[in-house]
UniProtKB/Swiss-Prot annotation:
Source taxon at top rank: Bacteria
Cofactor(s) listed in the protein's UniProt record: [2Fe-2S] cluster
Name of protein: Ferredoxin, 2Fe-2S
Annotated family: Belongs to the 2Fe2S Shethna-type ferredoxin family.
Annotated residues for binding of [2Fe-2S] cluster: C11, C24, C56, C60
Function description: Ferredoxins are iron-sulfur proteins that transfer electrons in a wide variety of metabolic reactions.
Keyword list, A-Z: 2Fe-2S, Electron transport, Iron, Iron-sulfur, Metal-binding, Transport
Record organism: Clostridium pasteurianum
InterPro entries, per the entry: Fdxn_Clost-type, Thioredoxin-like_sf
Amino acid sequence: MVNPKHHIFVCTSCRLNGKQQGFCYSKNSVEIVETFMEELDSRDLSSEVMVNNTGCFGICSQGPIVVVYPEGVWYGNVTADDVEEIVESHIENGEVVKRLQI
């Protein structure tokens, strides 16, 4: 996939310096990545949407953080249960999920 229609970044950081407050990794962000991949596959969107885990975005208190490009929309306090709504509303229908947007 050279030019995906959407690119989803999920913070999976487990910052070890003790200064951050959220620790996305400890809030099951790896499960969020897996759920995105499963949801996209079930909707036959895997060839159009790339999902990557990433390091800290610097706003741990609102994590887990998900960022969707090309729109540059940031979502906070995301759980695996929110993934279906993000895929259906944002990816398929172009509508930002306002309740999660930061």
